[in-house]
Structure formats: C-alpha cells, structure tokens
Curated annotation (Swiss-Prot):
UniProt source species: Streptomyces avermitilis (strain ATCC 31267 / DSM 46492 / JCM 5070 / NBRC 14893 / NCIMB 12804 / NRRL 8165 / MA-4680)
Protein name listed in UniProt: Large ribosomal subunit protein uL14
Subunit structure: Part of the 50S ribosomal subunit. Forms a cluster with proteins L3 and L19. In the 70S ribosome, L14 and L19 interact and together make contacts with the 16S rRNA in bridges B5 and B8.
PROSITE patterns, alphabetized: RIBOSOMAL_L14
Lineage of source species: Bacteria, Bacillati, Actinomycetota, Actinomycetes, Kitasatosporales
Entry annotated with the keyword RNA-binding: yes
C-alpha cells in the first residue's frame, strides 16, 4: 500500500533511482495505491545524464509492494521492496528496460508494454 509521502525505488532505466509519491490518482478521496495503480510522484534521487532530473514531477505505475495483496484464487503476493515504473502521458513506460519482477495485476490493468519488457511476471 502506497500513500502520500511514500518513497519507492524506480524499476526502469530512465535515470531516476528513487521517487516520492505526492498523489494517488483515481478519485478525490483515494488514500492508498497498490500494484497496477498510477500515482503522481517527484524524483528524489537520479543519476547524472538520465532522462529525468531530481525535482521532476512524473506519473508512475506501481509494480511491486511490500504489503501483501490477495489474489482471486486465494493466494497472496508480496515483494521485498516498493517499486514503480515512470510513465509517459499516454501510459507507456518512459524507459526501455524494466528491472526485477512485476505483479500479474499489471496485465489486468492493461500495462502490456511493461509486461513485455519485464524479465519476470509473478
């Protein structure tokens, strides 16, 4: 579960290393975001020469959360870290590579480009 002020690792090659959630999209009173949800975030740490700079405001989709999520078949999925992938305005990933596994929930939310780039879908 990601909320305002949550810090996430960036799981792509845009140049950002860490982002901070400033808004959860999807309704005026929405407080938490899980795997497959879109957030507005600011870049807190970035490498020199990357596509994004520290202080940039970006949209990102969450691909891994520490808080477990119940699946319809009764199983649970959780990861060791909170991570997100930075998006363009049309919903495609801004980077060209994805690092680490991503949740299967992204397929249901129609993030097929991220699914195809990811090395593993859990």
């Amino acid at each position: 579960m990601i909320q305002q002020e949550s810090r996430l690792r960036v799981a792509d090659n845009t140049g950002a290393k860490e982002i901070l959630c400033i808004r959860v999209l999807g309704g005026s009173g929405r407080r938490y975001a899980g795997i497959g949800d879109v957030i507005v975030a600011t870049v807190k740490d970035a490498i020199p020469g990357g596509n994004v700079k520290k202080g940039d405001v970006v949209k990102a989709v969450i691909v891994r959360t520490v808080k477990e999520r119940r699946r319809p078949d009764g199983s649970y999925i959780r990861f060791d870290e909170n991570a997100a992938v930075i998006l363009k305005n049309d919903g495609d990933p801004r980077g060209t590579r994805i690092f680490g596994p991503v949740g299967r929930e992204l397929r249901e939310k129609k993030f097929m480009k991220i699914i195809s780039l990811a090395p593993e879908v859990l």
